[in-house]
């Protein structure tokens, strides 16, 4: 079995990505990065998902970006924006987040002798994020193949972004086909300690709209449905 | 004054790079990454150098790569190779190290509104490292400009690698012109707690040979000269 490093946040997209990697026959090594998020609920969800989907190994890397960054996701003094109030690049954007996470995945892939990295970015719902677009993923892959022993020796690394062109409702349908229980995942930017979602932030809005568009009951634990 | 993020390990190359950035008129923000190195001497040197060269701000980021990697620099069970015993890519290679460090510099540059990152890689002395070559630096820069808000908006980021084509003796001459006291820097892979260099590892060998080739007395504190 070929090994793959899968970036796993515990949200809907990365969980579906892990299920896809597994469904494609890869031995999956999950990597979760705690870059100073405000909610432990996300990492708790990642732990659950790693166990449920039986990854070969699950590593958690702590990297406190709060000393560098001051975005809504890492700085408690900044309010998470309510959906619809921001334009362009969201205020919840963490600088260079995907570049940092892919770099860490690259390091582990090299150690494992893996040539495959999976990341659950999607260009459709999060079009405001520059590092979720196909040209970015291609550029990272090119750089990575010049950065490593393996790439230089012709064992080319592939960055898989299987959701990149899928709208949320198609991601949800794909995940349900693969047997995912989405009530176990947490997408919310400000979930409470038990993993209940706020129902108000951009991530909650996109998730709710996705289940509605897929015409599938939304199993998410929302605080306003408690 | 334009701001620059400068990656600073406290070794000869990164210290010279910082002096060059400063000499070019940049307001310098030093970033040191503790990726699980075995010696605290390197970080102590970085602290000293940051103070001596009067950086605007100096951030230390802790990132324990030892959970992922098992190279000589991070795994205490692996012996640091004595110079001349290894071929091709050195055993002291840390997977994706420069990619990770440049990614963190990219994050800080974006937060600071800086379009300039300095890194002290050199393709001459460390030709075994894939991520020290010009084509790698170019590829990182291309990727970075697709990864960030600033790059997408046309405010292009530049990755400066001013030493990349210089042999060690030219780096040393350049640094002395800029007033660097190289006795304050630590290059050794296994310096002791006080910063005394082993004199035996690849880094020590290259450093010693550099001073010899420059025909300049080597001010390094070597354990075998104690």
UniProtKB/Swiss-Prot annotation, chains A, B:
Cofactor(s) of this protein: Zn(2+)
Family annotation (SUPFAM superfamilies): Adenine nucleotide alpha hydrolases-like
Keywords per UniProt: ATP-binding, Ligase, Metal-binding, Nucleotide-binding, Queuosine biosynthesis, Zinc
Species: Nitrosomonas eutropha (strain DSM 101675 / C91 / Nm57)
Binding, ATP: 8-18
HAMAP family, A to Z: QueC
Family label: Belongs to the QueC family.
A GO MF label: zinc ion binding
Lineage: Bacteria, Pseudomonadati, Pseudomonadota, Betaproteobacteria, Nitrosomonadales
Residues noted as binding Zn(2+) in the record, renumbered to the chain: 188, 198, 201, 204
Gene3D superfamilies in alphabetical order: HUPs (3.40.50.620)
Cofactor note: Binds 1 zinc ion per subunit.
Function: Catalyzes the ATP-dependent conversion of 7-carboxy-7-deazaguanine (CDG) to 7-cyano-7-deazaguanine (preQ(0)).
GO terms classed as biological process: queuosine biosynthetic process
Gene name of the encoded protein: queC
Protein name per the record: 7-cyano-7-deazaguanine synthase
């Amino acid at each position: 079995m070929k090994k793959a490093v899968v970036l796993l946040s515990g949200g809907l997209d990365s969980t579906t990505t892990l299920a896809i990697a597994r469904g494609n026959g890869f031995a999956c090594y999950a990597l979760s990065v705690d870059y100073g998020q405000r909610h432990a609920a996300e990492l708790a969800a990642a732990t659950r998902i790693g166990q449920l989907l039986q990854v070969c190994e699950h590593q958690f890397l702590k990297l406190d970006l709060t000393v560098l960054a001051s975005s809504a996701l890492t700085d408690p003094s900044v309010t998470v924006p309510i959906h619809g109030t921001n334009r362009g690049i969201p205020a919840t954007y963490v600088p260079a987040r995907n570049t940092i996470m892919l770099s860490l995945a690259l390091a582990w892939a090299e150690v494992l002798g893996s040539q495959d990295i999976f990341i659950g970015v999607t260009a459709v719902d999060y079009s405001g994020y520059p590092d979720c677009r196909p040209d970015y993923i291609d550029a990272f892959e090119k750089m990575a193949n010049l950065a490593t022993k393996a790439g230089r020796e012709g064992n080319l690394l592939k960055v898989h972004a299987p959701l990149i062109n899928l709208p949320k409702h198609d991601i949800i349908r794909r995940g349900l086909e693969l047997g995912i229980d989405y009530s176990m995942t947490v997408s919310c930017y400000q979930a409470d300690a038990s993993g209940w979602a706020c129902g108000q932030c951009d991530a909650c809005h996109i998730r709710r709209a996705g289940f509605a568009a897929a015409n599938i009951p939304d199993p998410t634990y929302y605080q306003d449905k408690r």
